Regions:
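Sec-dependent N-terminal signal peptides of Gram-positive bacterial secreted proteins and lipoproteins
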Residues: 2-25
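Exported/periplasmic ABC-transporter solute-binding proteins
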Residues: 21-231, 235-278
Length: 278
């Protein structure tokens, strides 16, 4: 499949009148059309299959093939990145690139976020369309140290969550039971940095516990906890029906998926319709 050009995208924006692309008048439109034409072909940067961010992005943007559990319609010319950092690095270096990452990672020079349907990723009114939950999933019943950690995550740990994401509960007091044990947590790269920060803070309170956080992807993490190779899985997507039957899970944070482009790209706004088009 031939990659579309940025100038084509802008032309469609104007013709359909579905999006203003962040522009204020016809002169700006003309200038942006010229700048977009210089960018050439659009290079889509996508996460790998199994990524919770990819799964959720495809679902929310409306290009799953066969419903919520279907294969998504990510363009076959997309460059595949195996982590958020890789997406950001690629977009940073390529003026014609567009990608998507957890909004909690934004702030790196060289990339900018696009408004979606006129709503900024910083919107706190609940109107931003690419919003999801972060989950910790586990099999069976939590043991003492696992329950202690989960309680921490959903209480005092929410203060750490609030630094980058939307909390799921008000901060509450926490008194550790000082249980001993090791908790292996695997899964989403979008969640890994947050969970490492929470785990480090918890281990200062409960010095008898050891928590190991390994970033793979949501699907690998869920498969790992189902097979008994770890105690908890980080999932940045909703669990599928069969996973819900086999696992228990708790919400630990709310996140937004940001669509990012290079700073040289003149666009500031895009719609879900246009995302599907590219």
């Amino acid at each position: 499949m031939t990659r579309k050009k940025w100038s084509f995208l802008f032309t469609v924006c104007l013709v359909t009148a579905l999006i203003g692309c962040g522009q204020k008048n016809s002169q700006v439109d003309k200038n942006n059309s010229e700048e977009l034409n210089k960018l050439g072909q659009i290079q889509v940067i996508s996460r790998e299959e199994g990524s919770g961010t990819r799964d959720t992005f495809a679902s929310l943007a409306g290009f799953n093939k066969d419903g919520a559990d279907g294969i998504d319609k990510t363009v076959n010319t997309a460059t595949i990145a195996d982590s958020m950092d890789s997406v950001i690095e690629t977009v940073n270096k390529n003026p014609s690139a567009i990608g998507y990452v957890s909004a909690g990672t934004i702030g790196i020079d060289g990339v900018k976020t696009l408004e979606i349907n006129g709503e900024a990723v910083s919107d706190n009114k609940g109107k931003y369309p690419l919003t999801r939950s972060f989950y910790l999933a586990y099999s069976g019943t939590l043991n003492d140290v696992e329950q202690d950690f989960m309680t921490y995550v959903q209480s005092v740990g929410q203060e750490i969550v609030s630094g980058h994401y939307e909390t799921i509960a008000k901060n509450a007091t926490f008194l550790s039971n000082q249980s001993e044990g090791t908790i292996r947590i695997e899964g989403s790269t979008s969640m890994a940095a947050l969970m490492k920060e929470i785990a480090d803070a918890y281990m200062k309170i409960n010095t008898h516990a050891t928590i190991q956080v390994t970033a793979t992807d949501s699907t690998k993490g869920l498969n790992s906890v189902m097979s008994g190779n770890c105690e908890m899985a980080m999932s940045s997507r909703d669990l599928k029906d069969y996973e819900k039957e086999l696992l228990n899970y708790n919400t630990v944070a709310k996140d937004k998926i940001a669509v990012i482009v290079n700073q040289k790209n003149p666009l500031s706004d895009i719609t879900l319709y246009m995302l599907k088009s590219i």
